[in-house]
Structure formats: C-alpha cells, structure tokens
A protein has these predicted regions:
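Intracellular juxtamembrane helix-capping segments at the cytosolic ends
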Residues: 130-142, 344-358
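Juxtamembrane intracellular "pre-TM" segments in multi-pass secondary transporters
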Residues: 12-22, 200-232
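Helix-to-loop junctions at the C-terminal end of transmembrane segments
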Residues: 77-89, 277-291, 388
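C-terminal transmembrane helical hairpin of 12-TM major facilitator-type secondary transporters
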Residues: 293-346
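Helix-loop-helix hairpin linking two adjacent transmembrane segments in secondary transporters
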Residues: 146, 153-200
Length: 421
C-alpha cells in the first residue's frame, strides 16, 4: 500500500482476531449462503414493483423508485458503513448492521405509508452492505495460500443470490403476496445475525483515527492504489456487460419466437445461474499462480458467449432464430451461463488481489472495489435500455461487447506491462 494512503487514516496496526478461528468448510458454506441471502434484498424488488405500486398507490414513476432506492441505499452503505470495518470491532459491527437490516425489512413489510416504505427500503439497502463486511472477514480467517479459494467460495454464494433473487421473490410474492417476501427476508436476516454472533471471531482493528478521516482516506486509496484501480475498473466493465444482458433478456424472451411468460423467464434465470459454479475454481487458480491465464480465459469466454447470445437472439452470423427456436433457447442458456462464468472469474480474482493488500484498510478497499463495479453495473443497465430502444437485441449485445472488449484490452495491457498477477 502507498504510504500516503496509509497515512491518510493513520493506521497503526490491525489485530486479525482476539479469538482466532480458521475458515472451515462448513463455515465457508455458511458465509456463502449468508451473502447470497442478504444480496436478495437489493434485487428482489425488481419483479415486485408493479404489485407494490398497486398496493401502496404509488404513481408509476415512484413505483420504479422501489428497486432503485434499495441499490442507492447499498451504495450509501458501501461509503458510510463498510469503512467502519477498519475502525470498529468487526463481529459486533456485522451483527448490529444485519440486525438493523432485519428491522428495516420488517418495517417495509408492515408499512402502509408510501414514505415509510420507501425510507425503509433505502435503509434496508444501506444495511445490506454488511455483505462487504462479511467477505473481508472470511478472507481474514483464511490462510493466505487459500485466500483466493475462500473468497471464490463466498463469491459463488453472492452471484447465485443475485441471479436467484428475482425468481425467488416472484415465487414468494405469487404464492402469498409481496409483503411476505419482506417478512421472510427479515426473519432470515435476524436468524443469520444470531448465527454469525455465535460463529464469528472477535476482530478488533487497532487504529488511531476518527471516522471523518477514515472517509477522507477513501479518495486517497482510490487515487493512489494501482492494484485497486486495475481490478475495480475491470470488474466495473464486466459487470456492465452482465447488467446489460440481464436487464434486457426478459424483454427478448417475451417476444416471438420465444413468447416466454414470467415463470419461464424465471426458469431461464435459474439455468443461467449455473455459471456461478466456476467461482471457487477461479479462486484456486489465483492461489496457484494461474490468475493471469484465468482472467484472459474468462474475458475470452465472455466474448464468445456474447457472440452466441447475439446469434440466438438477433440472428447474427446467418443463424435463424425463427427456424430453430429450441436451439436458440439452448444457445441463450449456454451463453448466459458462460457470460456469468466470465464475470465471476474476473470479480473473484479481483477480490483476491484486493484482500491480499494491507489488512488495515481491507474494509475500505472492499467497499471501494464493490462501489466502482456497482457503478459499472448501473451504466450497463442504462446503456442496455437505450440500446434496446434503438436497435433491439443486437444493440444490447453490442453494449456487452464494448464493455467486455475494453476490460479484455485493459487486462492484456497489464500482461504486457507485467502488472497482472
């Protein structure tokens, strides 16, 4: 870490844990399941906006805020809450943040007022940033030689949670109403808080600083840390491609010749989630010194996947979707899984690099990394919507190609310069 970055928060030392505990296989699985469940708070509202809007008498414009507010809250939590990992005892911080999240979800479930509901959704999103406290906690509990594998295993839960959040919310809301989803989420988060309190070690960062100085150090870290810059930029670009695809795929599947209803689109999302299985493999590749090759392979896989997706949805390369609809669906499923695999490879290896940096700034580094790729995802969704309106599915695939090609180019430049691990 650059001295200026370290001095900006006047970090003296970091005590990894007063009660050392190794990251066992069952505990790794629990971490993965926990982040997978919590991340659903951010994306599950998207298929529920219409039902919520009708129930709370929200205008169409305000109904769209439901999904956006959760993610805006998450972004605020990354900046304001996650850096506290470098200042406060981590177990207590994680448990209290997750307990708060459960409380805000419960308020959202019972809210009859539009204002109360929207504020509760925002605060639930902010406290869902506890995910980015759990990932560095898991990394700190793993031996350095296995840190990539540990991060990869936890990230697999995160990616599965993102992909499964929409169909899960649709199923729960369809069976017992949208309020039930928030109730179930609140109960699960409260239970997770209890289990985490029992299983997490005490970890006290020993710092001499104040909260405002800690926040000011975020900009210094982002400006001076090349490892953070490279990995966050690449993660943002591939997340942009990922978001562009998943933002528009439901629109394409609803069109002929597919004409999928909501249930079939949910099943498609489940099938596409298969790409997350490569996450622990990517982490192991990084631990074995093959991270550079895995990154290049991941980006090439994404480019090939986008070509297949373009052929299946927009008749690229002379393929006829109308003449071969079943084959087109198979190509879309395979392409979605391959695209997801490339994204999680990049993010897992990026996470590994971030968590091998100075432990005293691990919370801030993780918060910045996620914040930057979160911006990439938002840009991908925005460009996807515009591309769909202007050029249909071909435009969406072109957006994915541009994002992925730039990420691939940046990684190749890093290989040539010898800066890639």
């Amino acid at each position: 870490m650059n001295p200026s970055a370290e001095n900006s928060a006047r970090v003296v030392a970091t005590q990894e844990g007063d009660s050392p505990r190794q990251l066992t296989a069952p505990l790794t699985f629990f971490f993965a399941a926990a982040v997978g469940v919590i991340v659903m708070n951010l994306f599950a509202a998207q298929p529920l906006t219409a039902a919520i809007g009708r129930s709370l008498h929200l205008a169409p414009g305000l109904a769209g805020l439901v999904a956006m507010l959760a993610q805006l809250g998450y972004a605020a939590g990354l900046v304001l809450l996650v850096p506290l990992c470098d200042l406060l005892e981590n177990r207590r911080l994680i448990v209290q943040t997750l307990t708060g999240c459960a409380g805000f979800l419960a308020i959202a479930m019972f809210a009859d007022s539009r204002g109360v509901f929207l504020v509760a959704v925002f605060l639930a999103g902010a406290t869902s940033s506890v995910i980015q406290m759990l990932v560095p906690m898991a990394a700190s509990m793993a031996a350095e030689s296995h840190r990539g594998r540990a991060v990869g295993n936890v990230m697999s839960g995160l990616m599965l949670g993102i992909l499964l959040s929409r169909p899960t919310a649709s199923v729960i809301a369809g069976a017992i109403g949208w309020r039930a989803f928030y109730g179930v989420a609140a109960a699960i988060d409260a239970l997770l808080a209890v289990v985490l309190y029992v299983n997490l070690p005490v970890r006290r960062p020993l710092v001499v600083t104040r909260y405002p100085a800690l926040l000011r150090s975020l900009w210094t870290l982002l400006r001076t840390e090349p490892v953070l810059q490279r990995n966050a930029a690449s993660a943002a670009l591939v997340m942009g491609a990922f978001s562009a695809f998943w933002t528009a795929i439901g629109l394409r599947l609803a069109q002929p010749p597919f004409s999928f209803d909501m249930n079939r689109i949910a099943l498609f999302a489940l099938a596409g989630a298969a790409g997350a299985i490569v996450t622990p493999l990517a982490g192991r590749a990084g631990d074995r010194g093959a991270g550079r090759k895995a990154l290049i392979a991941g980006h090439l896989t994404m480019l090939i996947a986008l070509a297949a997706i373009g052929a299946a949805g927009a008749d690229w390369g002379g393929f006829s979707t109308g003449a071969h609809p079943a084959l087109a669906v198979a190509l879309l499923v395979a392409g979605a899984a391959a695209l997801d695999a490339g994204v999680v490879t990049d993010q897992t290896l990026g996470r590994r690099a971030i968590n091998l940096m100075n432990p005293a700034a691990r919370g801030r580094l993780n918060g910045l990394f996620v914040g930057v790729f979160f911006v990439g995802g938002a840009l991908g969704a925005m460009f996807s919507g515009a591309a769909w309106s202007l050029a249909g599915w071909s435009g969406v695939c072109a957006v994915g190609f541009v994002f992925t090609s730039v990420a691939f180019g940046l990684r190749l430049i890093g290989v040539v310069r010898g800066t890639e691990v």
